[in-house]
């Protein structure tokens, strides 16, 4: 077995300074995200979403970013899933994007709110038919006796709704409204560049460099 202590690499692809970044973090994120898309990285919109329940127990999972604008970061899920229940109890969360091939990470922290029904309806209508049916068939995060039960539910809802399943009331979007972002660029000798944006009471963003 490979020794974990021997698994390491040097980071040499780029650098990041306070003068390099955009004056607001959303513009900087869009810049880096566009570069990840241009580099044809697999699923550049994949992000780790970390939530905390009412008892302080954290959990994390990979979800897909489905919207980005000046308001924040949008994703969609089952409101009755574990993450949905966590967010109902504690509407604060963190995101992490890791673009390995570019030697970059972006960390995001903030409060989470539900998007409007119109936004959820509009996105749901763009999903493939199987995904729309699956949103009805899966009681996400709950125990299921076997896959056959899940597939039976899928067939039942496919027969019920045909080609036009409506959006389930328990399914929709969230928006993480950021209060802090950090842009990390790998550098040699583990002296990585870390540029952080912190939202100030007046609405401006403070830009600071953090030690690696």
UniProtKB/Swiss-Prot annotation:
Pathway: Cofactor metabolism; pyridoxal 5'-phosphate salvage; pyridoxal 5'-phosphate from pyridoxamine 5'-phosphate: step 1/1; Cofactor metabolism; pyridoxal 5'-phosphate salvage; pyridoxal 5'-phosphate from pyridoxine 5'-phosphate: step 1/1. It catalyses: pyridoxamine 5'-phosphate + O2 + H2O = pyridoxal 5'-phosphate + H2O2 + NH4(+); pyridoxine 5'-phosphate + O2 = pyridoxal 5'-phosphate + H2O2. The keyword Metal-binding does not apply. GO terms for molecular function: FMN binding; pyridoxamine phosphate oxidase activity. Keywords: Flavoprotein, FMN, Oxidoreductase, Pyridoxine biosynthesis. Gene3D superfamilies: Electron Transport, Fmn-binding Protein, Chain A. It is an enzyme of class 1 (oxidoreductase). Its cofactor is FMN. One of its GO terms (biological process) is pyridoxine biosynthetic process. Transmembrane segments: none annotated. Substrate binds at residues 8-11, 66, 123, 127, 131, 190-192. Signal peptide: none annotated. HAMAP family: PdxH. Homodimer. This is Pyridoxine/pyridoxamine 5'-phosphate oxidase. It comes from Cupriavidus necator (strain ATCC 17699 / DSM 428 / KCTC 22496 / NCIMB 10442 / H16 / Stanier 337) (Ralstonia eutropha).
